[in-house]
Regions:
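Positively charged n-region of N-terminal signal peptides that target proteins for export
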Residues: 1-5
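Bacterial N-terminal signal peptides
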Residues: 6-14
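Generic detector of short alpha-helix boundary/capping microenvironments
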Residues: 8, 60-61, 118
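Short linear sequence elements within intrinsically disordered, low-complexity coil regions
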Residues: 12, 50-51, 102-105
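Sec/Tat signal peptide C-region and signal peptidase I cleavage site
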Residues: 15-20
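Sequence context surrounding c-type heme c attachment/ligation sites in exported
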Residues: 22-36, 41-44, 66-200
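N-terminal post-signal-peptidase region of extra-cytosolic proteins
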Residues: 51-66
């Protein structure tokens, strides 16, 4: 009986500690980001959880109904753009998501910029301005049926970027299909950059 009481007491003490850990995001550095295909594939994007709560992140990402993501969730469609769910109250405007724009190479990741409503990607789009259009139940996460505006890259292009992430160990050469998709993407980026007003 004494052993059972002690066991219950230890569990009761451990639960608040576990809950506290789940409610605070781990420190985020360049080492927090890795080869995109080493993350968990959900439909056409990849997810992870910096707090170790990957099962819950995958469950929410796989749901069609929409609900808040757990703290520590990492979402990526392409290697250079990341969303990380921070602790509750970190930034109410972005529903506690922090946006990251990365440079990636064989040696790893470098954070080009990070923040909230001010972060833009290399295609010229403001991350928050796109994601804020997602319907409320989808926790600021875009998909083709979530209410966000269409993005200028196709599934073939995002897939090619995922499969050619330089941080990954590539054991096969780039396919003709991926090479063609990347060429098309390069033309789109060139056109977007050409349409930008000249900097003063």
């Amino acid at each position: 009986m004494k052993i059972s009481i002690l066991f219950v007491a230890l569990i009761a003490l451990a639960c608040p500690i576990a809950n506290a850990a789940d409610s605070h995001s781990a420190p985020i550095t360049e080492k927090s980001f890795k080869c995109i295909t080493d993350m968990t594939h959900v439909r056409h994007f990849y997810v992870d959880n910096l707090n170790g709560n990957l099962k819950e992140t995958v469950r929410v990402a796989s749901s069609d109904k929409g609900e808040p993501y757990p703290v520590g969730s990492v979402l990526q469609l392409v290697p250079t753009e990341v969303m990380v769910k921070r602790e509750k109250g970190f930034n109410p405007t972005t529903k506690d998501w922090e946006f990251f724009e990365l440079d990636v190479s064989k040696t790893g990741s470098t954070i080009r910029t990070r923040g909230f409503v001010e972060v833009s990607n290399r295609f010229g789009g403001n991350c928050f301005n796109c994601h804020v259009k997602a319907r409320p139940e989808f926790d600021l996460v875009c998909d083709v049926t979530h209410g966000c505006d269409p993005i200028p890259i196709t599934r073939a292009m995002s897939g090619a970027l995922q499969r050619t992430d330089p941080r990954c160990e590539h054991k096969t050469p780039i396919s003709d299909e991926d090479a063609a998709a990347l060429t098309q993407l390069g033309a789109i980026v060139k056109a977007i950059n050409a349409a930008k007003p000249p900097t003063q």
